Regions:
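Positively charged n-region of N-terminal signal peptides that target proteins for export
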Residues: 1-4
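Sec-dependent N-terminal signal peptides
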Residues: 7-12
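Short, conserved catalytic or interaction motifs in soluble domains
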Residues: 20
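Mature extracytoplasmic or organellar-lumen-exposed domains after removal of signal/transit peptides
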Residues: 23-361
Length: 361
């Protein structure tokens, strides 16, 4: 009897050692190291650089409104464009402090409502924080104020100097930039403490840092990069009818530059790359979890998309009008990224895509 009991105990111990291990036990990957790299070397520096460009934009706006002249207008446009380009490197991080401050909804709703902007300027009475003004503020609204709709620099300058509502227009411009600066400052400040939360929220649940990051990347790429910057303007969502007025930076005519800055920073984020350093990224995570083939597809498709987007020229709206098929071809390259990004990678890492999408990819 005792011999039989001993055999049973040994058998039970043997079976317990044969239990399937959790995913975290089966595969070895330094998730904490990846989050530290992404947070410390990519996200925080991106916001800090963006804040610096917004500070410069604010100073340039003060200089221009105090003394409106052509050199100051041109300098303001340079500062505006630089801030807009640097925003592209932050837009993907719509979680944590960015979500708390609703950066995307406040900074980059386009096409902007020019009629509403004109009414706000004419009345001199406005509140840019109300929901009804969501499409009359941020970078797209500033784009319209500084460039106008195919109007000369002399005319634009006159709207800030001699026109009936010149004082109101200066006030509106300053209010828009102050709004961007205020929310940028708040977000950068919040990341000072949130970075610890980001680096220590391990695991793969929806609320984990990995879950937030992968969901944010997918939502951004699909809705705001692929569709917003290319698909919608070229007519993918309108039965092939082009909508060139819906390009980003339509009035300043540097839509393709914004697209390229956005896609390049997205590619670097996936690779964990900052500057010339290739740190731990989602690519390494996939390889560690036997997802080398998925990583290879993502790398190749992203690289192909970067090359394709670099063939676009500004003004993108004009290229859409003159050669719609060439822009549709770029969209096709962007589209190839979707399956490995949205389906294969999250499945391999055990991350649930939790945002809603109704366009059928």
């Amino acid at each position: 009897m005792r011999a039989l009991l001993g055999i049973l105990i040994v058998a039970l111990l043997s079976c317990s050692s044969c239990k399937p291990k959790d995913k975290e036990e089966e595969k070895e990957f330094d998730l904490k190291g990846m989050l530290a790299n992404v947070g410390d070397n990519i996200i925080v520096p991106a916001y800090q650089n963006f804040k610096s460009t917004v500070d410069i934009l604010s100073v340039a706006a003060d200089t221009f409104t105090n003394n409106p002249n052509t050199p100051h207008l041109l300098s303001l446009r340079v500062a505006f464009k630089n801030a807009y380009i640097n925003w592209q490197k932050c837009d993907v991080f719509e979680f944590g402090p960015a979500m708390d401050n609703a950066l995307r909804a406040n900074f980059n709703v386009y096409p902007t409502d020019t009629a509403k902007i004109t009414t706000n300027v004419s009345s001199g009475s406005f509140n840019i924080d109300v929901l009804s003004n969501s499409d009359a503020k941020g970078f797209p609204a500033i784009d319209f104020l500084l460039y106008g709709d195919n109007q000369s620099d002399a005319y634009i300058l006159s709207t800030f100097t001699t026109h009936t509502h010149a004082a109101n227009k200066k006030q509106y411009l300053l209010a828009l930039i102050a709004g961007i600066k205020s929310k940028t400052d708040a977000t950068v400040s919040a990341w000072g403490t949130y970075i610890t939360t980001f680096k220590t929220s391990l695991g793969y649940s929806v609320g984990s840092s990995a879950g937030l990051l992968v969901n944010a990347m997918n939502s951004y790429y699909e809705r705001y990069l692929r569709d917003g910057k290319v698909g919608i303007p070229v007519g993918i969502r309108s039965l092939g009818i082009a909508l060139p007025l819906q390009t980003e930076a339509f009035y300043g005519k540097f839509s393709a530059e914004l697209l390229n800055a956005s896609l390049q920073s997205f590619q670097n984020l996936y690779l964990g790359k900052y500057g010339t350093t290739n740190g731990l990224g989602l690519d390494d995570h996939l390889v560690a979890y036997d997802g080398a083939a998925i990583d290879e597809n993502l790398r190749n498709y992203l690289a192909d998309a970067v090359v394709a987007c670099n063939t676009l020229s500004d003004p993108l709206s004009q290229q859409i009008i003159n050669n719609q098929p060439s822009v549709e071809a770029v969209y096709s390259k962007l589209q190839k990224v979707i399956i490995p990004l949205k389906v294969d990678m999250p499945s391999k890492l055990g991350i649930l895509i939790s945002y809603q999408d109704n366009d059928g990819d």
